[in-house]
């Protein structure tokens, strides 16, 4: 038994650095859509993790295009594509862990992706991250979520949390009745935000949104995030499903995806 660690990095220089820092990781400098051409020992994986890119640009993936329907639709925006492609590459019981823009959870038009995810996997954890989280590294405020799923294609029904994850809503922004932009209803319940507070503000586009803040040091934030994840994994993660329920394989295959277009 052993762990097989793979990494995909699209940027050449970043890929070279990554391969030097992690000598035991098999690194390929290419796009995620070309993973099937890399000659990895595994074609499906137990864990797929990334801070994924976002944007309204298409990805050419012949395999998903041939499937048509929502698979082809997912290739029209890169963040939707990453979720669907990764879920297709997971072993049953495997974990998908992505930091992503809030568009996946909040945009009404992305409901088809949310439906695909909760119908193919159990929602383990959904945590709304503070808007300033990437300020030091990227110099911009960006709304992000940490979403973790465990692939479970034979699930009987959606949980209450998963049903909430499908829904979006708006809030009153002021006394005149101006409404905020849409936001996912799951983040209205306790223990789903990495924040000490939130308020409605106007963003750089003049739209009203709910902004999340963390007032405290990074160590305290890390400890609170760890506590949230421990709580969610204790409640929702199925170890027997992850281990294959006695199917015999003791190898663990992990893939990390890094993309230069994401802060």
Regions inferred by a protein language model and the residue ranges of each:
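Conserved nucleotide-binding/hydrolysis micro-motifs of P-loop NTPases
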Residues: 54-55, 103-105, 133, 153-155
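A short acidic, often aromatic-flanked loop/helix-cap motif at beta-alpha or helix-coil junctions
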Residues: 33-36, 132-136, 196
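Conserved Class I SAM-dependent methyltransferase catalytic core
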Residues: 10, 73-133, 146-148
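Short secondary-structure boundary/capping segments
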Residues: 21-22, 63-65, 112-115, 142-144, ...
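Residue-level detector of conserved catalytic or cofactor/ligand-binding positions
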Residues: 255-263
């Amino acid at each position: 038994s052993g762990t097989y660690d793979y990494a995909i990095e699209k940027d050449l220089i970043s890929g070279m650095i990554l391969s030097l820092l992690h000598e035991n990781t098999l690194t390929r400098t290419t796009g995620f859509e070309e993973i099937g051409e890399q000659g990895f020992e595994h074609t499906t994986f137990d864990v797929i993790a990334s801070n994924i890119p976002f944007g309204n640009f298409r990805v050419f993936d012949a395999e998903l295009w041939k499937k048509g329907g929502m698979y082809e639709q997912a290739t029209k925006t890169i963040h939707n594509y990453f979720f669907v492609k990764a879920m297709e590459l997971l072993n049953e019981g495997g974990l998908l862990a992505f930091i992503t823009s809030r568009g996946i959870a909040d945009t009404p038009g992305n409901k088809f992706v949310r439906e695909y995810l909760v119908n193919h996997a159990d929602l383990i954890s959904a945590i709304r991250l503070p808007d300033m989280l990437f300020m030091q590294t990227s110099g911009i405020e960006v709304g992000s979520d940490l979403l973790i799923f465990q692939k479970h294609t034979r699930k009987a029904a959606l949980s209450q949390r998963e049903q909430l994850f499908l829904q979006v809503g708006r809030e009153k922004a002021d006394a005149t009745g101006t409404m905020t932009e849409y936001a996912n209803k799951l983040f209205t319940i306790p223990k789903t935000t990495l924040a000490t507070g939130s308020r409605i503000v106007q963003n750089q586009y003049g739209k009203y949104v709910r902004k999340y803040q963390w007032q405290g040091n990074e160590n305290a934030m890390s400890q609170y995030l760890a506590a949230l994840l421990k709580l969610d994994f204790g409640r929702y993660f199925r170890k027997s499903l992850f281990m294959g329920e006695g199917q015999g394989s003791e190898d663990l295959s992990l893939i990390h995806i890094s993309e230069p277009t994401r802060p």
